[in-house]
């Protein structure tokens, strides 16, 4: 009889865990169906909304691809592809990314490698239809993705702040980009990353279950602030859209999913 009670207890526990798992997984929203760009809009600096200049953004092999096959030069053609079906405020974002191939030389210097393995995800982005024609970056917070060349340290999941300001350890970050504490990823392997975003209060960047960057008090201001938001300097940035960046190096994105938090 005792064994039967123990068995029943274990069975109930396993059923509970199973239900919890199902309930949790059902809260995740997939932003990319692996087949199309339904729900996404793109904006490339110098071009109108949804003008996919030189077919920069494509779908293939179940991924969103940023490609530069048709480019001879990267002439500040900063691009972003936005999930515009929904704004997000408090959320947990997960995605995988992978750099591949060679970057496109910048028009400033054929040997300028600043955009080598350089991309990112923009959090709390403005809507792309608000962006000016030549605007390089949406007002947002960037989780910057960088990759190494096999030589020097180059952490990923850094924080950049186009049109925004943040505090790190209670002090305003004075640099536009601040390095995380992550390791350098030199290969072209897939990298799984996470972001925990709590409105304007705090954001955490996570890789391999390790929090490598945290910042708080997200607000409008700083460099790259669009003239559309000048009157908002100092105001909290509480919510926005999610966008992926094209900055001169081929990259793929997949498994892009969000769970909204209370």
Task: Locate each region found by the language model.
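Carbohydrate-interacting regions of secretory-pathway proteins
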Residues: 19-262
